[in-house]
Swiss-Prot record:
GO terms for biological process: bacterial-type flagellum-dependent swarming motility; chemotaxis. PANTHER family: FLAGELLAR PROTEIN FLIL. One of its GO terms (cellular component) is plasma membrane. It is found in: Cell inner membrane. This is Flagellar FliL protein. Residues 1-25, 58-98 are annotated as: Disordered. Residues 26-63 are annotated as: Not required for flagellum motility, although mutants lcaking this region swim less smoothly and are more sensitive to O(2) deprivation. Disruption phenotype: Forms a complete but paralyzed flagellum. It is a single-pass membrane protein. Belongs to the FliL family. The lineage of its organism: Bacteria, Pseudomonadati, Pseudomonadota, Alphaproteobacteria, Caulobacterales. It comes from Caulobacter vibrioides (strain NA1000 / CB15N) (Caulobacter crescentus).
Length: 205
């Protein structure tokens, strides 16, 4: 009799387990890659946020602060300068002569108002206010007068204080006042010469 073919021996359980587990072993590498990519993304975002939100170095902050302080100081200086210029302009308007061109080449030189306390017989205070304008032949004479203005004002003040109110009464008194003022101003202006003294305003109070 012929022998029955022998049955194939069943494959060991270990081998089947090995074949069944083979596909499962491929999953861990994919998971690791995904986790690594996520870590990189999060790490990159964190680094960007760190650099963006990172406080400026102390040196840069100090320079920025110094620039602000310098701008503030410059602004204050400009404001002070503007204020001083305005004050000087106001002083100039009140204490310097006004020079204007007149007809036929003459120049009008108006002095700041002169106020003096005059003598009176009864001892009462009487004030004289004068607004005087000189008629000059040219601008060069005005240039000669301006530096000597303090001397001229002192000379006028001394002379006017010696006057009494009755000395200025009538046209004769006004004429005599012009003559005396013209003589004195030409003493200061020499060798230049003032043509005339014009009394624009005269008040006695």
């Amino acid at each position: 009799m012929a022998k029955k073919p022998e049955k194939e021996a069943p494959a060991p359980e270990g081998e089947e387990g090995a074949e069944g587990e083979a596909p499962a072993k491929k999953k861990p590498p994919i998971l690791i890659i995904a986790i690594a990519a996520g870590v990189l993304v999060l790490g990159g975002g964190g680094a960007a946020a760190f650099f963006l939100l990172k406080p400026k170095p102390a040196a840069e902050a100090g320079e920025h602060g110094e620039k602000k302080e310098e701008k503030k100081k410059e602004k204050k200086k400009e404001e002070k300068g503007d204020k001083k210029d305005a004050e000087k302009g106001a002083e100039g308007a009140a204490g310097t002569p006004v020079i204007k061109e007149g007809p036929d080449g003459v120049v009008f030189y108006t002095l700041p108002d002169i106020v003096v306390n005059m003598q009176t017989a009864d001892g009462k205070s009487t004030f004289l206010k004068l607004k005087l304008t000189f008629e000059l032949p040219d601008e060069e004479t005005a240039d000669e007068l301006t530096p000597n203005l303090p001397r001229l004002q002192d000379m006028f003040q001394t002379f006017l204080r010696e006057l009494r109110p009755e000395d200025l009464n009538g046209s004769q008194g006004t004429y005599q006042l012009r003559v005396e003022l013209l003589r004195r101003v030409n003493l200061v202006a020499a060798p230049a010469k003032v043509n005339a003294v014009l009394i624009e305003e005269m008040l006695i109070n």
